[in-house]
UniProtKB/Swiss-Prot annotation:
GO BP annotation list: translation
NCBIfam families named among the record's database cross-references: rpmI_bact
Taxonomy, superkingdom: Bacteria
Source organism (scientific name): Streptomyces avermitilis (strain ATCC 31267 / DSM 46492 / JCM 5070 / NBRC 14893 / NCIMB 12804 / NRRL 8165 / MA-4680)
Protein name per UniProt: Large ribosomal subunit protein bL35
Gene that this polypeptide is encoded by: rpmI
Thylakoid in keyword set: no
A GO cellular component entry from the record: cytosolic large ribosomal subunit
Length: 64
């Protein structure tokens, strides 16, 4: 039987760490930043950890 393909959209958006946590980018920092406060844009930097329930679904999409 052939291997299952991982979900290409999910593989672009999420990353699974060595310990099994799923990381995601925070929403709202792509464009239209001019009216957003510096405090908000700083807060949106870096990766966030997925909630356990959502992480389970994402791992299934990624085949992990």
């Amino acid at each position: 039987m052939p291997k299952n393909k991982s979900h290409s959209g999910a593989s672009k958006r999420f990353k699974v760490t060595g310990s099994g946590k799923v990381l995601r980018e925070r929403a709202g920092k792509r464009h239209l930043l001019e009216h957003k406060s510096s405090r908000l844009t700083r807060r949106l930097t870096g990766n966030a950890e997925m909630a356990p329930g959502d992480a389970k679904k994402i791992k299934k999409l990624l085949g992990k």
